[in-house]
Amino acid sequence: MYLSPDFIVIGSGIAGLRAAIALAPVGRVLILTKAEPTESNTGYAQGGIAVALGDDDSPDLHAADTIKAGDGLCDENAVRVLVEQGPPYVQELVDWGTRFDRDADGRLSRGREAAHSVRRVLHAGDATGREIARVLWTRVSELKSVETANHALVTGLLVENDRVVGVRFYDQLGFPRDARAKATLLATGGAGRVFRETTNPPVATGDGVALAFHAGARVEDLEFVQFHPTALNVPGAPRFLISEALRGDGGRLINGRGQAFMTRYHPDGDLAPRDVVARSIVREMDMTGGSVFLSLSHLDADYVTKRFPTIADMCRQMGLDLARDPIPVGPAAHYVMGGVETDQWGRTSMPGLLAAGEVACTGVHGANRLASNSLLEGLVFGARAAVAMQEPPAAAAMASGRRRADHATPITDYRSPGSHRPLTASEVRDLMWKSVGLFRTREGMESAVAKLEASYAAHREALATARADDADAWKQFNLVTVARLIARAALRRLESRGAHYRDDFPERDDINWNAHLVDDITL
């Protein structure tokens, strides 16, 4: 195993793999994964990858849709990078053998999803992320300068003279290891598992955000958590994602009375932005006292089952026929727009540390991510981070250039002594779902923050006496850390914008809150 590689990549999703491929020709690369290498959010991405390749499309149109969905908070320079550099990187995937669906004349098939003005979403059935990951892993496996350590428990970043110089981790046999490198990339994915209801796999616990925060890096915009409107809503079953592409192909949301309802909430109906659809579903459930369903019975049954084989199979396991039965759906935590603050090259506020993909906050998504932009973000910014990793580390901290909400109430004003009993993972997830979920209030969030602050302190104390390789203790600590950061940010933003909705501040406030919230270890 390389313990003195040139570059370290933590994570094995699209951002980490694309970075490793770019770094391999110039040095030795160590990829650290917390589970099996193919277990990442990338592999669970169904809908597709959005990119302006059609004759009726352009980077300008893609940028406009992205910015509109972001509800006034997108970093427009980052958006330009995404939409302009996306096409060549996606073409590279095609050249490498990615089997995107094609139409009858052999052209790439383009789907439409919510808030897109044209069809621009390339897909591989309903398992696009898995197909992209297959191609990237095939290329990585051919690179002799890239080594992968599976089931590695990363417990901290090595910091010397205010610069990240490597990582501390435990290998799959439980032996402690320190690996030092010129640059370290966080590509650890999302944090959906902080919430009780989520479409994310078990690995998505926000480890990268916690690692960066404890090393001294800034985090940004963590109040913006996207709740996907249509997860399978069967009691006792996992919240399996029911792709937005189903609605893009004509699927309709109906209430328990069989009535379509989305046009009552938004002029774009079933293809309104995700945050709008998610809240509308909950309101419809409350109003009718029943469930909400996705109906595809008016579409061709053969087309539905062939276009969405993975979803059809999961529904079949639940005793449901995707093409004929109303499918019960409801919102679930899906994606975190915020993360470790970075510039457009993945550089964080800590020299030697970079971040790309969902763990990072480039500002490209603003307050609400446009559907199917996540795979594109990982691809583009993973490759760009690899370029920055080859440069000499900056002498000073990175500056993103984004406007900050420095007037926000300091979080110390919200702290209460409380009891130092550590919350269990299940208690954290229940608390976040109930108090920092789709609908937020000051009272609920103040209570959540107080409990999470106390639990954070208790977990820190517990770690001091726990075995250093106690994986459960570290996972609990990371989970509480990220939950605490999300709750703190949500409490401080006194408005509603994008995925952040407060019953006590229901309107968007551009005068006071058209800015980004930053947190770090000193606050």
Predicted ranges, named:
Residues 1-5, 22, 28, 36-38, ...:
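Glycine- and aromatic-enriched mobile tails/lids
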Residues 7-31:
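N-terminal Rossmann-like FAD-binding beta1-loop-alpha1 element of flavoenzymes
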Residues 35-67, 71, 237-240:
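Conserved N-terminal glycine-rich FAD pyrophosphate-binding loop of Rossmann-like flavoproteins
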Residues 37, 211, 217-327, 388-392, ...:
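An anion/pyrophosphate-binding glycine-rich loop and adjacent beta-alpha core
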Residues 74-87, 120-138, 149, 198-206, ...:
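Short beta-strand to alpha-helix junction loop
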Residues 95-175, 180, 187, 196, ...:
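Conserved redox-cofactor binding core of oxidoreductases
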Residues 156-178, 320-364, 370:
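FAD-site-proximal beta/loop scaffold in flavoenzymes
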Residues 183-240, 373-384:
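Glycine-rich loop(s) and the adjacent beta-strand/alpha-helix scaffold that form part
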